Design a protein with these regions (language model features):
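Short amphipathic alpha-helix with an adjacent loop that forms part of the alpha/beta core around
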Residues: 10-13, 46-54
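Short, acidic/turn-prone active-site loops that include or flank metal/cofactor-
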Residues: 41-46, 86-87
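Short, structured coil segments at secondary-structure junctions
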Residues: 15, 32-34, 78
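Alpha-helical elements of the RecA-like P-loop NTPase motor core of helicases
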Residues: 29-30, 46, 69-73
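Conserved beta-strand scaffold positions in the cores of enzyme catalytic domains, especially
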Residues: 6, 19, 36-38, 82-84
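Flexible, polar/low-complexity N-terminal or interdomain linker segments that lie immediately upstream
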Residues: 1-30
């Protein structure tokens, strides 16, 4: 198994794929990257096939990096093109 794909969030550009902030709604409303959409971690993990397309690239972020690391690991195993975007 490969290592976790990771970039610094400052290197993210919209043309790379969709940036998803996995924070809860309250934390997202307090602070988030201007290009990020919010899909809370638990919701994405339950309904990933509803939100994600295996033919697209995604960059996942959260405030502490724990949820985004877990999500990238699981979703990559399931065949999605996902990268952790860290601060």
């Amino acid at each position: 198994m490969r290592g976790l794909k990771r970039i610094n969030i400052n290197a993210y550009q919209k043309s790379m794929g969709e940036l998803i902030d996995l924070s809860g709604v309250v934390d997202y409303n307090i602070s988030h990257h201007p290009d990020a959409i919010n899909i809370p971690y638990q919701r994405l993990m339950l309904y990933y096939d509803h939100y994600l397309d295996k033919n697209k690239s995604y960059y996942l972020t959260c405030h502490k990096g724990i949820h985004s690391a877990k999500a990238v690991t699981m979703l990559e195993y399931l065949g999605y093109d996902v990268t952790q975007a860290v601060t």
